[in-house]
């Protein structure tokens, strides 16, 4: 699929990103895991691609460069134990559906922390009117970033008021956020680059400046303009794309959905015991306490 990429702060990894930058597309699934499990997830993605499209791989010289992204979960997970294995990622791929994904403490988000509350996987979406048609834009985040005093919700500095249940020693940014923006709008790779950059505004609304130790990496892709692999296609390609002058509502949809997805990740999360330091608990945000701040 055609794609674009942006890194607000590059202290992280997203495999396949160099080719997205150069060619404007990627092939295969997207996996998001913890920092030390990128290799295991990558192996699973390659195996899944080869097994799923065996005829193409056996009869052509093809190579796999799947997209695998990561954030650091070493506070809540024994990250150095390398407990995520290729078979776990394979099971996730085999069980993938078109149903709305679970949020909070699921998948790669199981061990993530967001603004010193329990973070994880979050989603949000918007409908966008463009060119006389209704299109969809969806966002998935793995939210693992920010310090408590930074947190803002709808522009309100709620983190400064929610000062209880902080993790001991958690006084520096050491997380990251991965943002995936998917749309059926027909967009060129250059337009998808620009769309990916708007995730910066979405997470910025939540309060983060993109800390030095944070890997804030954003990928946008379009399911329009279906394409075959270059090795299996003819000499010419044609594409339909949205007029640049109609992009503003698309940008706003992305900004709003990214902001909402981060909040949804926190609201869906559950309390989780810490691994380092042991004996503490990372609390989920108290939705009722948050609501009272807006009363």
Range-by-range predicted roles:
Residues 1-295:
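Alpha/propeptide regions of enzymes that mature by internal proteolysis
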